[in-house]
UniProtKB/Swiss-Prot annotation:
Phosphothreonine: residues bearing it: T805
Post-translational events: Autophosphorylated. Phosphorylated.
Class of this enzyme: transferase
Lumenal domain ranges by topology: 32-42
Species of origin: Homo sapiens
Tissue: Mainly expressed in skeletal muscle, and weakly in brain and pancreas.
Predominant localisation class: membrane
Residues that bind ATP: I143, G144, N145, G146, W147, F148, G149, K150, V151, K168
Description of how the protein assembles with itself and partners: Interacts with PPP1C and inhibitor-2.
Name recorded for this polypeptide: Serine/threonine-protein kinase LMTK2
UniProt keywords, alphabetically: ATP-binding, Kinase, Membrane, Nucleotide-binding, Phosphoprotein, Serine/threonine-protein kinase, Transferase, Transmembrane, Transmembrane helix
Protein kinase domain mapped to chain residues: 137-407
An example Gene Ontology molecular-function term: protein phosphatase inhibitor activity
Catalysed conversion reaction: L-seryl-[protein] + ATP = O-phospho-L-seryl-[protein] + ADP + H(+); L-threonyl-[protein] + ATP = O-phospho-L-threonyl-[protein] + ADP + H(+)
């Protein structure tokens, strides 16, 4: 616009200049005459032209300018101060908080981007409560203020209604961070919809003054209400109101925590009361303005409620107080203080302390807690206990949900009559105060929700009971093991220390035996001997030993042998209290125990025949426990290890699997036969453990037995009578349950050459049990085939009386007193030496289990015996061959310390569930040639002589023995490996079958088993041998990885002949049960340990997951020396009748002698005697040598846990002759009892010096002792044993041996980890009931359960620390199902046995916790019927261990069946333990609807 005017101006100026110039030029005109006229005219004309032009231009320019000025488009706005654009400015919101700008003004809203979105939940735009129209709010008054600004009481208009609201207004000067904090503080109340949480009605965030609109609680905050109503807060109604309010406060906080919201200032002042007296947890942010006395100000001008703040949130730096943000744990602390306020009339916490005092005493020193509230109310102590839970260290505090549950329970209980079971239920509800990382519980995804939400860090142990089509499935999870006394005591591998995982799956057979025998197969004892898993598993009455139908789950944590000893002593104490049953129970306990040793050393160690002085020094019992006695060890050994293990050890392993319950029948069973009380106990144990191996063993009595002229018909008759007595008394329920078995056994015996009368008696007494086992599996035929797979070599040395007693003991008649010569005792010691020791030489029963028998042994039933038998048999052959070469070897075997002998006896007892039965039979057979009494005594004398001879030989051949053990290891590895595969897997369950501590001095079941197993060696039942070793807790043994693998034959010089049938890797052909009576302090175990060594070393666990199993192979190898630890241990020190089977091959005799030498110490024997477990005829001399003879096992053996055990036990020469202490070591079902028995004898002697296993005083995983086991006597013994254990603890070898032994069955890996006692879950009729969960499985139990069983109450009982989840699915983790199927069977049969030592140790350790926990539950179809149904298992189950032991320890899972069976066994049912902090079990108990009966009561009961 300026351009044109400038141009025009220029033109105008130019025109003016021209005009001026023209006028100037024309002005001067001279006045001349006429002549000058023309020029003037010219100038004027040019001038005119110029002027005209100038005018024209000027006019144009002027017109142009005028037009420009008049042009409307031209705007000079830039020159003006125009403020019209600023009219849109909105005045500050503070000036018009509720007034919006005029409509004509353009408004810019706050960008949504600047607003923080809720972290948890963003409500839909349609339902945005935040869109509360500001104009709908009307402020009434300001009621307080906070850091954020003002809090106003107002009204909100919604349509035609008006409601009171509380408005929190954020100050306009708030920065973005403060805005974010302001909105986040309101998030929980905006998102959560809960009746006990304050509701945020809406948010106003479209304009600067952010508003949060909350519901208004008419009665104000709870603190002011209580203070105002203090005068009226009296009476029951007001107390109930306060209790309800407490529950509502906890519920509100729990709802916040569930969605991970935290309360910024939880206190009574921030709990608001509605008009209907409902409490709402919230925060208006005005606490400080209304209750300034409750807050203190920090140097940075921040205020916080000191008296409600958790100590961990407050710290000081350079005299400046610093506070951290709230956490869930700190919220729990504040919750406790809030509840205290509620119950104390809204008093100020620590009102007697100044803020500085509170800061020092409560926050910094943490030594002051709030006193008990003044409110008088029912269970006021429990209410206060809940508050105290909230003030524990952060990791131990309960979750808000736990607090709410506890308060709700207390509130309900306060409103009803007091319940008898209140304490139990309360304990069940109590949160676990032991801190744990919830991540540790991730093993079971199904538990993740519970672990994260509820248990979280606090969940120590979780037992999951899942009801499946197969029955109840048990999953046990516990925290990663902590280094504890187990670790300290364990000399085991470094790997075996921390977390011990044990998977326990009850085998169908186990269940059926436990729950009820087949409909038509009830024993005289009233126990059926079903081969299937019973539909209903009776609950084991921990306190009612007389209940034959009682069954329980026993978990034992892998730990050092010492640990196991610790617990076994506790068990021992109880056993000692009741000497009659001590043997069986001890046997049971011992069987559970496993020595933690290296595989190589384990085998040798278990073979007490090694020359290593360590071995010799170890008491036989220890040896037995470590090796032969603990089928668990065998179980956990790998296939190779099992192969390495002599067949007898395999049998023992199988015995543990199948005869787990049989193991529980301590040698006391035999005593029980003699003494009704004992008989009862034994019967129970028998019932509990299927007598797989031993049942088969008697059937497997080999031709040697039949050929043994020494067998006294009277003895057989006595055995039979005892057996019948047990049966009639329902003591031999498991093995005796089947008359079919009895008949079969009788037939077998007849075939074997037994007189019908003898067979009748023995079958009736011991054979009934055995037959039951046989019923479970073809094991019965073992006797016939047994008749001597190896001829004389496969002699089952049955001390006439001891064997009888063993048979009487039924599965428990494992002849704890008698030491199974699992070692290579069969090595041919000069026949003369054996006969020379006629007394000591028990008749050797060549109990060879035919392959099917062994297979059946592998099945829960027959497996147990075959393992030992095969081991023994193979050993016998090897020994026979070797003995001839080096009689010293057998002597060396004999040289095993008496403790070894005791161990052997115990092991024998435990191992020879059937074996004990066999031993009885054998003894009877032995006695047959002689007059009952005369022959019995004569035989005993001979046995003693043989033992002495063996002792001499042992001294000579200790080194040879070591070599032999090595040879055995290698040969056994070749033979026994196979045998062990078959034996260890199949036989462990049966091992606990019959235990007759009385006269059964030494049961060289190992030889017989070795021989019989030798033929079946190829069959690998390793999985049964040891529980699944997968890291996955729920993994079952059945899984392929659990199969035992043949160990390198290099295992020591294991005698090739040891497993004569070593070629058969799978199953021992015919278990040869050699039961030798150990004369004074003679140890048949030495020989046995060798065999075990071979087997154990040979076997190793495939799975790298379970440290337990990993260690178990070692343990197993430890066991290997006596392949059947039971057999080893079973050798009794008690003198047996002189009569020696003339036909016994020298090796068999030697075996017998060795077995006798392996016999438990005098103490053990005497214990057995005193427990009247040894009541078997044949004057069972209570091991005359109080100090176990120190036999020097072979170097390998010495290095092996067995040798260590032997050494320790021997070192426990202080091992007092435990006349009152049962020496029985039931390695399988009664592993714990065996262990106890062993512990009583071996621990008293060697444990006093070595093993702490029996130490109940040592805190369990849960830091609890097994005092609750009801084994007060055992505990006492355990204390003695503990002292011994402590001593032994000093002797790491023994300690580790025991631990390895116990842990062996569990897993070598677990062995490596600290062995934590596994809680023993006891089920008993008297216990709480999970009846709904315990449903009979028709499929599993082909035979209808006996009416009694059906009528019986099923109960799962836990004590305070067990959390039980009941899920209606196959397995908590589906992946476990298939695995469970495979591994379950073996696990059931094997894990418990395999964990025999670890299991025992756990039983012992966790006994304290578990027994305390009272963990007992009954499962009907927890496990697949078929796999677990191995006849051995069912027999084992039918012949449960005596209740006494069972009440202390859950019976080991039914004996494992052969591979074929246990892969099938209960894929879904499993009881697994996964590493978790062993510190404690979660007190929280969740029950499924299935547990209606048990439900709350059961829950409480669980506690």
């Amino acid at each position: 616009m300026p351009g044109p005017p400038a141009l025009r101006r220029r033109l105008l100026l130019l025109l003016l200049v021209l005009l001026i110039a023209g006028s100037a030029g024309a002005a001067p005109l001279p006045q001349t005459g006429a002549g000058e006229a023309p020029p003037a005219a010219e100038v004027s004309s040019s001038f005119v032209i110029l002027c005209v032009c100038s005018l024209i231009i000027l006019i144009v320019l002027i017109a142009n300018c005028v037009s420009c000025c008049k042009d409307p488009e031209i705007d000079f706005k830039e020159f003006e101060d125009n403020f019209d654009d600023e009219i849109d400015f909105t005045p500050p919101a503070e000036d018009t908080p509720s007034v919006q700008s005029p409509a004509e003004v353009f408004t810019l809203s706050v960008p949504n981007i600047s607003l923080p979105a809720p972290s948890q939940f963003q409500p839909s735009v349609e339902g945005l409560k935040s869109q509360v129209a500001r104009h709908s709010l009307n402020y009434i008054q300001e009621i307080g203020n906070g850091w954020f600004g003002k809090v106003l009481l107002g009204e909100i208009y919604t349509g035609t209604s008006v409601a009171r609201v509380i408005v929190k207004e954020l100050k306009a000067s708030a920065n973005p961070k403060e805005q974010d904090t302001f909105l986040k503080n309101g998030e929980p109340y905006y998102i959560l919809q809960h009746p006990n949480i304050l509701q945020c009605v809406g948010q106003c965030v479209e304009a600067i003054p952010y508003l949060l609109v909350f519901e208004f609680c008419d009665l104000g905050d709870l603190k002011a209400y209580l203070r105002s109503e203090q005068e009226h807060m009296r009476g029951d109604s007001q107390t109930m109101l306060l209790q309800r309010m407490a529950c509502e406060v906890a519920a509100g906080l729990a709802a916040m925590h569930k969605l991970h919201f935290l309360h910024s200032d939880l206190a009574l002042r921030n709990c608001f009361l509605t008009s209907d007296l409902n409490v709402k947890v919230g925060d208006y942010g005005i606490g400080f303005s209304r209750y300034k006395e409750d807050y203190i100000e920090t140097d940075d001008k921040k205020v916080f409620p000191l008296r409600w703040t958790a100590p961990e949130l407050v710290t000081s730096f350079q005299d400046r107080l610093l506070t951290a943000d709230q956490t869930k744990y700190s919220n729990i602390w504040s919750l406790g203080v809030t509840l205290w306020e509620l119950f104390d009339n809204a008093a100020q916490p620590y009102s007697n302390l100044s803020n500085l005092d509170v800061l020092n005493q409560v926050i910094r020193e943490r030594d002051t807690k709030l006193p008990k509230p003044q409110l008088e109310q029912p269970y006021s102590d429990r209410w206060y206990e809940v508050l105290q839970f909230c003030w524990l260290s952060p990791e131990k505090r309960p979750a808000a949900e736990d607090v709410h549950r506890l308060l709700t329970y207390l509130r309900l209980q306060s409103q009803r009559d007091s319940e008898v079971d209140f304490e139990q239920q309360w304990n069940a509800l109590k949160p676990n105060t032991n801190s744990r990382d919830s991540s540790n519980n991730a093993a079971f995804p199904i538990l993740d929700h519970f672990a994260r939400d509820r248990l979280g860090r606090e969940m120590e142990e979780v037992l999951t009971v899942t009801e499946t089509s197969q029955g109840l499935s048990f999953e046990y999870v516990w925290e990663a093991a902590k280094h504890d006394h187990f670790d300290e005591r364990s000399r085991g591998h470094l790997d075996e220390g921390l977390s011990y995982t044990s998977i326990f799956y009850p085998v169908e057979v186990f269940e059926s035996s436990l729950s009820d025998p087949g409909p038509g197969k009830q024993d005289d004892s009233g126990q059926d001997v079903p081969l299937r898993v019973p539909g209903v598993v009776p609950v084991f009455d921990a306190h009612n030993l007389s209940v034959g139908s009682d069954y329980y789950i026993q978990l034992e944590e892998k730990s050092g042998s010492n640990l196991e000893l610790d617990y076994p002593p506790a068990l021992l104490t109880t056993d000692m209290d009741n000497p009659e049953r001590t043997g069986p129970e001890l046997s049971q306990l011992t069987a559970l125990r496993s020595v933690e040793l290296e595989e190589s050393s384990t085998d040798e160690d278990f073979f007490q025949s090694s020359t290593d002085p360590k071995d010799s020094s170890l008491p036989g019992d220890l040896h037995v426990t470590s090796g032969p006695e603990s089928p668990f060890n065998n179980i956990f050994n790998d296939v190779d290890k099992s192969e390495d293990l002599p067949s007898h050890q395999k049998i023992f392993d199988l015995m543990e699997l199948n005869g787990v319950q049989a193991d529980f029948k301590p040698a006391t069973l035999s005593s029980s036969l003699d003494n009704p009380k004992e008989s009862v106990i034994t019967g129970h144990f028998e019932k509990e453990k299927p007598r797989k191996i031993f049942d088969s063993e008697p059937l497997c009595l080999s031709d040697n037995l039949m050929h043994q002229d020494n067998f006294d018909p009277l003895n057989v008759q006595e055995l039979s009578e005892n057996f019948l007595f047990l049966q009639e008394k329902n003591l031999l329920k498991g093995s005796l349950s089947s008359k079919e078995h009895i008949n079969d056994l009788q037939t077998e015996l007849k075939n074997a050459g037994f007189t019908e009368a003898m067979l009748e008696t023995s079958c009736r007494n011991s054979l009934d049990t055995e037959l039951q086992f046989a019923e479970n599996k073809p094991g019965l035929s073992l006797l016939q085939e047994n008749v001597s797979t190896k001829g004389d070599d496969t002699d089952v040395m049955l001390t006439g009386d001891t064997l009888s007693t063993s048979l009487q003991s039924s599965p428990e008649v494992q002849v704890p007193p008698t030491s199974f010569e699992t070692e290579e005792t069969p090595r041919r010691v000069p026949p003369d030496s054996l006969p020379t020791q006629g007394e000591t030489q028990p008749t050797c029963l060549d109990v060879i289990v035919p392959e099917d028998c062994l297979h059946q042994d592998i099945s829960p039933d027959a497996v147990t015996v075959p393992v030992e038998i095969l081991s023994t048999d193979a050993r016998t052959h090897s020994l026979d061959n070797r003995s001839q070469d080096s009689p010293g070897e057998s002597e060396e075997t004999l040289r095993l310390t008496e403790s070894d002998s005791v161990l052997a006896d115990d092991i024998l007892a435990s191992r020879v569930s059937v074996g004990s039965s066999l031993p009885e039979l054998g003894q009877e057979l032995h006695n047959k040639p002689f007059s009952e009494d005369h022959h019995s005594h004569r035989r005993l004398e001979k046995n003693l002589e043989a033992v002495e001879t063996l002792n001499q030989l042992n001294s000579k051949d200790a080194a040879k023995e070591a070599g032999l053990v090595s040879a055995l290891s290698s040969d056994s590895t070749s033979q026994d490996s196979l045998l062990e595969d078959s034996l260890s897997a199949p036989f462990p369950a049966s091992e606990p079958s019959l235990e007759t501590p009385d006269s059964l001095e030494s049961v060289d079941v190992h030889e017989a088993l070795l021989d019989s197993l030798g033929s079946h060696t190829p069959q690998k039942l390793v999985p049964p041998d040891k529980p699944a070793d997968s890291g996955y807790e729920t993994e079952n043994l059945e899984s392929p990885e659990w199969t035992l693998h043949p160990a390198p034959e290099g295992t020591a010089d294991s005698e090739p002949a040891t497993t004569g049938d070593g070629g058969h890797s799978g199953l021992p052909p015919n278990p040869v049960i050699v039961i030798s009576d150990a004369g004074d302090g003679h140890r048949g175990t030495e020989v046995t340990p060798e065999t075990f060594t071979a087997g154990s070393q040979g076997s190793y666990r495939d799975s790298a997951y379970f440290s337990d199993n990993d260690s178990e192979p070692e343990k197993r190898s430890e066991e290997v020396p006596g392949t059947s630890p039971s057999a080893l241990v079973l050798v009794q020190e008690q003198p047996l009748p002189e009569p020696v089977l003339p036909e016994q091959s020298p090796a068999a005799q030697d075996s017998c002698l060795e077995a006798r030498k392996s016999q438990p110490d005098e103490s053990c024997l005497s214990a057995l005697h005193n427990s009247s477990d040894l009541e078997l005829r044949a004057t069972p001399e209570p091991a005359q040598t109080g100090v176990p003879q120190q036999v020097h096992p072979t170097e390998d053996e010495a290095s092996s846990p067995w040798s260590v055990l032997n050494a320790e036990l021997s070192s426990g020469d202080d091992f007092e002759t435990q006349d009152d202490r049962p020496c029985t070591l039931a390695s399988t079902g009664t592993n714990t009892n065996e262990l106890l028995a062993y512990t009583n004898s071996a621990l008293d002697k060697s444990l006093s010096s070595h093993s702490e296993g029996p130490k109940l005083k040592e805190p369990d995983i849960e830091g609890k002792y097994l005092g609750k086991l009801g084994v007060s006597g055992m505990l006492d013994l355990s204390e003695d044993g503990m002292d011994a254990d402590e001593e032994d603890e000093n002797s790491d070898d023994s300690d580790e041996d025991l631990r390895a032994f116990n842990l062996h069955s569990l897993s070598s890996e677990s062995e490596d980890e600290t062995e934590h006692p596994v809680p023993i879950i006891l089920s008993n009729e008297d216990g709480r009931h999970l009846r709904s969960l315990l449903k009979p499985t028709a499929a599993n139990a082909p035979d209808p359960l006996p009416e009694d069983w059906k009528k019986e109450k099923k109960a799962v009982t836990f004590f305070d620390d067990v959390t039980v989840y009941l899920f209606d699915q196959e397995t908590p983790t589906k992946e476990l199902g298939p695995c469970g199927g495979e591994a379950c069977g073996p696990d059931l049969s094997g894990p418990a046995p395999a964990s025999g030592s670890p299991y025992l140790s756990r039983c012992i350790n966790s006994e304290s916790s578990t027994d305390e926990e009272g963990g007992g539950f009954e499962w009907d179809d927890d496990f697949s019927p078929d796999p677990f149904m191995s006849k051995t298992t069912s027999n084992l189950l039918s012949s449960k261990p005596s209740l006494q032991t069972s009440k202390y320890f859950s019976p080991p899972p039914p004996a494992r069946s052969t591979e074929q069976s246990w892969p099938h066994s209960a894929p879904y049912s499993r009881f697994s333990i996964s590493p978790a902090n062993i510190a404690s079990f979660s007190l929280t108990h969740l029950t499924d609807s299935d547990i209606e009966q048990g439900g709350s009561s059961e829950d409480g009961e669980k506690d």
